């Protein structure tokens, strides 16, 4: 259900600012009389939202004169694109304060004419009109690989200092073969082979970069082929 909710967010954000929502206090949750506005603090480095847009949206939600249900307000703010969690508090003086935790992009996917991020938790997030994150790119067919598999691959790359600096993009071609595009020492591509077993081959690639390329033994090549067990075939 969590994944379905996140997928729903991917498309809902584009119209969020144009839909007024009446927040009633008919269910459980703390109530607060609407004040002059809401203070917003954005948490996390990725600016999917800015304070002004979140404040305007919150003010729109609170524009009625009824008491505000802060729990419902939190749920509504959490539906904004790129928002992982929202918490709303009373400031003790009749106003409200909101903390907004934003997603951190891990990889940008290109599927046919669609492009979006997967975040570091493995959930899809729509692109932001405010900015573009510098993350590795993945081009594949729609539904070619589950998000969980893609998340595991790119999280492994991100957490490795050598690989994360070297790899710019990945292409998943026919037969689920992985082609990597890298720029360590020189621009080149890496034929990683089929999806199964990618971790061992990436560890082999990291060793080659660290012990051969960074040591200056081989710095000019067009392609590295890791499809053969225990080998790195260098092609000019």
Positions of PLM-derived features:
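Charged, solvent-exposed interaction patches on well-folded alpha/beta domains
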Residues: 1-42, 46-236
């Amino acid at each position: 259900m969590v994944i379905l909710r996140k997928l729903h967010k991917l498309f809902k954000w584009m119209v969020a600012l144009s839909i007024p929502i009446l927040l009633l206090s008919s269910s459980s949750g703390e109530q607060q009389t609407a004040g002059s506005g809401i203070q917003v603090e954005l948490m996390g480095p990725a600016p999917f939202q800015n304070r002004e847009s979140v404040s305007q949206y919150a003010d729109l939600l609170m524009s009625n004169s009824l008491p505000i249900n802060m729990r419902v307000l939190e749920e509504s703010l959490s539906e904004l694109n790129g928002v992982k969690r929202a918490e709303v508090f009373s400031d003790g003086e009749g106003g409200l304060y909101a903390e907004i935790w934003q997603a951190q992009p891990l990889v940008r996917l290109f599927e046919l004419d669609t492009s979006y991020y997967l975040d570091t938790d493995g959930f899809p997030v729509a692109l932001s009109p405010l900015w573009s994150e510098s993350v590795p790119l993945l081009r594949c067919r729609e539904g070619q690989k589950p998000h969980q598999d893609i998340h595991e691959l790119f999280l492994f790359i991100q957490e490795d200092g050598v690989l994360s600096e070297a790899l710019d993009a990945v292409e998943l071609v026919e037969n689920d073969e992985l082609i990597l595009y890298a720029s360590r020492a020189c621009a080149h591509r890496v034929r990683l082979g089929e999806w199964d077993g990618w971790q061992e081959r990436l560890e082999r690639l990291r060793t080659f970069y660290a012990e051969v390329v960074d040591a200056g033994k081989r710095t000019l090549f067009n392609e590295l082929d890791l499809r053969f067990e225990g080998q790195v075939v260098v092609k000019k």
